[in-house]
Structure formats: structure tokens, C-alpha cells
């Protein structure tokens, strides 16, 4: 339909922003990393010898820089300083899902080239949408990556299991984990059979369970049956009221579970749930997995949330 000119106005706006600024939000591409701490950016750039790379992603770069900052800080405690893909653009999956195929393919080709030219052996990705794009859509459409793409929850849990990162601070909190639908419903073998899949249910939970004093509670709808929080780009652009109502459904589940803090494995989920919490004046805190790990490590200066 989009290719035949029947796209909604919201899709047209996203296409225009992407073509102009290489991200669906229309934020200035030249300022992609401007909100991230200067010292952090300096550490992860100009590292031709690095064999581990990291992908920032649009939402983190423009609205949730503390996620990336805490991820790098945690990795540093394990003796790892990854290389950032400083020329990155949107992964293309949001555009593909909206029918903007040619726009998506242009992004995929560009990103595949810069990732392959980086010569990294592993690429740590925090955004579930980017993770799914690189592992499923890129190879499906012929944009093969010459590196292993790993979600940050898996990488951090491997470090925790090996003792490379520690948890020496008791948080003494009841915490819920919300499964991002991209991780829990679209990368699991139970839902998709036509490509190699990866179940991202256990790693985030095991990571949280390593933290002393945390009582982790499950939401009623979890794992492959988890509810979306409504953060999808198309929903936000064209049906924002519905998106907020969907988020309230998830927040109601968190409240019924008895938690006031929720950990998410998705920058978009953190951004959207936090926005609804602020608008509704609710007493919840949303943090990412890298942030909760940093909170539990006294050697780190945990970077606080910032207003968007």
C-alpha cells in the first residue's frame, strides 16, 4: 500500500525525518551523540584495535543517554572498552514495519557496511529492535553481518556468571521485569520458525537475580505472552492515545505485582513508560538493565535519569 501511495500522514512524516536525519524522530544527525557524556564518547571512539563493538541506537542516543553511559561504565569494570559505531544510522526496522521498504533497505545496506568495516568480532546491542533487525532482517534481505550480534542482557549476564562484574550493594527492593515484545515475542522459537531465533527471557532475569536484596516479581503476562507497552513507533506517531492506554495496562500489572520499580530491556520501553508515569503522576520508577547493574556496584557512579 505504501509503495502505491496509500501511506498515512504519520508514515509520510517518519519517511521525511528518516531521509533528512537518518532517524525516525527527526533529531539532528550531527548531534546524535551530543547528549552522551564527553568522556564516555571519547573512550569508545578511535579504537581501531577493539574487537568488541557497541551500537547506541536512536532512542538511547537522543532520549536515554544514561543507558549507554551505564553500559560502558559496567563494561569498563570488566576491563572492556568497546568500539562505538560512530557513523551509525537507524537500523531500518521501524521503517520496514511501516511499509517504507526502500528507506529501510538503504539504512540496512549502509549500516551493514559500517559494521563489517569495523572488523569487530562481537557487537553489543541494547535496543531489542536493532537486535532483531541485525539478526533476522539484515540476513533475510541479503545484508549479512560478519560479526556476532549479542543483546546487552546476554553479554552482561555472561560477565556476571564469570565473575567479571560484581554486585556488592544491596538494593532491598521489590522489582518487576517487563519483557519487551521484540525480545520476548519476536525472537523466540515458539513464535517464529523460519529463521534462527534466540530466546531472551532468562538472561535479564538471571542478571537481576544476581543482585543482593532484590525480590523479583513476575507480571501476570510475561515471557512469550508479555504485553507490549505501546512504545512502537507507528503507534506513537499515529495512535498515541492508544499507546498510552496500553502502557497503563502494563503499569497496572506492575502495581498488582506489588512493585514500584520496573526493569526493562528496551530503551523505547523505558522512554514510553516513563513518559506515561510522568503524565499520570504515578509512583513508579523505570530503569534499564545496565542502570540496575550499575546501581548494585559500588565502584560505579550510577548516572541518573535525565529529562528528555
Regions found by a protein language model. Give the residues of each.
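Ferredoxin-type iron-sulfur electron-transfer modules in oxidoreductases and energy-metabolism complexes
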Residues: 1-21, 106, 148, 212-213, ...
